[in-house]
Amino acid sequence: MKPARRPVFLHRPKLLDDGELAAAAEHFTLAESRLDVQPGDVVIARHFAWPWPRELFTDLGRLGARVVNGLRGHSYAADLLAWSADLGDLAPRSTDRFEMLPEAGPFILKGEKADKGRWSRMFAATAGDAVRLRSELMADSGMRGDTIVARQYVELMPLGPSPIPGACPPSVEYRVWVAFGEVVSAALYWPVDDCEPALVAAAPKPDEIPAAFLAAAMACVGTSLEFYTLDVGLDVRGRWWVIEVSDGLRAGMSENDPAVVYAGLARMLAHVTGRS
């Protein structure tokens, strides 16, 4: 019988959310260097791939380790156009061909990430505004080299005004963690302290996100990712959308409990690797 694979949590401590390291230590072997990885290990490379993902995944492969998501999954999650196309009508329409935009908007613009701290750096009312904003974003050193994408603006149910003047306001949006085809945790995307309590109380609970909607989204992207997040939101007309897909090795916890996320990941890893 082959020995069970050792799950290794390769991490950068300063980049982890509160409580994350203690939660990971309950289930995984902790490591801060790729030199600690042994042949046969299953590696959860948390916040470790940037800025040279190909180098990291190549090195770990040469060490004889298997990396959750791998380079293919890492690249897929970073490619908004790829996963948007796979999701189809489950996600807002997205394009990098600004000449094809209808004049009437509005649109949301983003590179690999959106500047949610400055709504004026995300929102464009018309196609002309989108073209001008793209030029500004391309000149921004923080987005230089990113593919700037325009997305159909979806007005989500509000959870209150922006806690910071000029920032993106909180809305009914949830971060759903998925590990190997199973939802292991779901919670508010926005910090609850930034939201109005009455609106949070009136909003759907995470377990009220339609199961069929989540299953459809997971079927679209789950062949490319093993451990990932779906940010899903409810619009003002009552329709659910996938707003974002993120690599679970990079996504923040939002309001999810790391203990729940990593217990779920450990359970699913044990299932797929045969570890008892």
Regions found by a protein language model. Name each.
Residues 1-31:
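Short, charged N-terminal beta->alpha structural module
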Residues 2-9, 39-43, 65-66:
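Hydrophobic beta-strand segments of well-ordered beta-sheets in folded domains
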Residues 19, 34-38, 46-50, 55-172, ...:
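Active-site nucleotide/adenylate-binding loops and adjacent lid/helix of ATP-dependent enzymes
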Residues 42-44, 110, 238-254:
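A short beta-strand motif that forms the metal-chelation/ATP-contact edge
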Residues 48, 112, 153-154, 177, ...:
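Anionic group-transfer/hydrolysis microenvironments
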Residues 161-166, 172-189, 241-246:
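Beta-strand scaffold of nucleotide-dependent catalytic cores
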Residues 169, 224-226, 246-249:
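Donor nucleotide-activated moiety binding/catalytic core segment of transferases
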Residues 185-242, 261-275:
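A long amphipathic alpha-helix within ATP-dependent nucleotide-binding catalytic cores
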